[in-house]
């Protein structure tokens, strides 16, 4: 097999193409580059780089942000459906926080489409109107993330209660084996909840600044966005390629 064939048929390339064949996989890739460009534009400006260098990075960031908005057109309907389905969840706290999260994200994405219309110049809003749209979009995104963090905090509490109960020894060997399996399941669930809460906490900084609740600089926001983009990419990579594929990555 030639060197070219080895490269083209390499398992890692196949996994990457499988990852990029999904809308989420492409979005996480674009988002990673977008926030990296955001950080680099801030870094180069602070370092005293030329205006052309900084502007190129800002243009890259803006182009990717606009492209991602186009990819999200109509996605608010998914969140409205998810909010409706969340009403069937038995645990009231999980149900209410899920509804709040999905409605927050859905409302954010509706305003996100208006931002795309303005950015693509398909329709131009006045400077005051687009500023208001952007600020309200950030508020709704922040609302969705806040409900997600509340849900994560509650799930952490429930899992700790389950973990304490699962640590008690059982009377029979069969029950003891079941207990060990349950312990592993709880630990896996805890890891997932902690991972999501870390991602949400970092993402929270971005709309909190956009909504003017915080005043963080572009460098911090760029790094926070890059970190959560890579975390989201990891989750999607595992979903597409499985844990073995994630380990290879």
Q: Which role fits each region the language model picked out?
A:
Residues 1-199, 205-227, 233-249:
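Glycine-rich, hydrophobic membrane-spanning regions of integral membrane proteins that mediate transport
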């Amino acid at each position: 097999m030639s060197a070219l064939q080895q490269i083209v048929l390499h398992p890692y390339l196949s996994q990457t193409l499988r990852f990029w064949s999904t809308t989420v996989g492409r979005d996480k890739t674009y988002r990673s580059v977008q926030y990296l460009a955001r950080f680099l534009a801030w870094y180069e400006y602070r370092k005293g780089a030329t205006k052309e260098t900084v502007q190129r990075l800002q243009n890259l960031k803006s182009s990717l942000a606009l492209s991602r908005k186009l990819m999200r057109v109509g996605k608010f309907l998914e969140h409205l459906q998810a909010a409706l389905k969340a009403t069937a969840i038995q645990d009231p706290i999980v149900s209410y926080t899920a509804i709040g999260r999905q409605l927050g994200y859905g409302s954010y994405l509706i305003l996100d489409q208006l931002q795309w219309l303005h950015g693509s110049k398909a329709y131009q809003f006045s400077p005051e109107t687009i500023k208001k749209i952007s600020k309200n979009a950030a508020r709704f995104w922040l609302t969705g993330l806040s409900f997600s963090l509340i849900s994560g905090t509650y799930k952490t509490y429930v899992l700790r209660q389950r973990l304490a109960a699962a640590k008690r020894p059982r009377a029979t060997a069969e029950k003891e084996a079941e207990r060990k399996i349950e312990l592993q399941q709880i630990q896996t669930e805890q890891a997932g909840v902690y991972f999501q809460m870390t991602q949400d906490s970092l993402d929270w900084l971005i709309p909190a600044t956009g909504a003017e609740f915080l005043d963080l600089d572009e460098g911090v926001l760029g790094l926070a966005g890059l970190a959560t983009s890579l975390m989201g990419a990891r989750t999607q990579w595992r979903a597409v390629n499985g844990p073995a594929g994630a380990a290879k990555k």
